[in-house]
A protein has these predicted regions:
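N-terminal "first-domain core" detector
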Residues: 1-59
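Beta-strand-rich solenoidal segments
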Residues: 4-17, 51-128
Length: 128
């Protein structure tokens, strides 16, 4: 018979996979507090992303807490002179690198632009 993990209990050593399973039932997203991971124009081609808390749920048995305690500024590339584009600012969880980063997903200039695709796999998971 396979073991059943009960988490957390005092005096028991756990692995990261046990903590990941603990967070798995939470829904992916950003904590709904005011100004949590808020993106605002910061002048020129920069945007400011505020601090925040969120969760990613890349698979049925994994969930990870994301905590960013300070704001960051991201630089966008210069736009096409005649064709608009849509960029996305995402929190990208990268399982291979074992970290989450803020990233700009740059769209393609087009007369009818669409937002770039996001990833929702167990290895790379984007929160928009």
């Amino acid at each position: 018979m396979t073991a059943i993990t009960t988490y957390p209990l005092d005096g028991i050593q756990y692995d990261a996979k046990d903590a990941a399973a603990y967070f798995a039932p939470r829904t992916s997203g950003v904590y709904s507090a005011e100004n949590c991971f808020t993106v605002t124009a910061a002048g020129g081609y920069t945007v400011r992303v505020s601090s925040g808390i969120g969760w990613v749920h890349p698979s049925d048995f994994e969930g990870y807490s994301i905590v960013k305690t300070e704001a960051d500024t991201l630089t966008l590339s210069v736009a096409d002179a005649t064709r608009p584009r849509i960029d996305r600012i995402v929190l990208r969880y990268d399982a291979a690198a074992r970290k989450t980063l803020l990233q700009v997903l740059e769209g393609s200039p087009d007369s009818n632009p669409t937002a770039p695709a996001i990833s929702r796999t167990a290895l790379v998971y984007d929160l928009v």
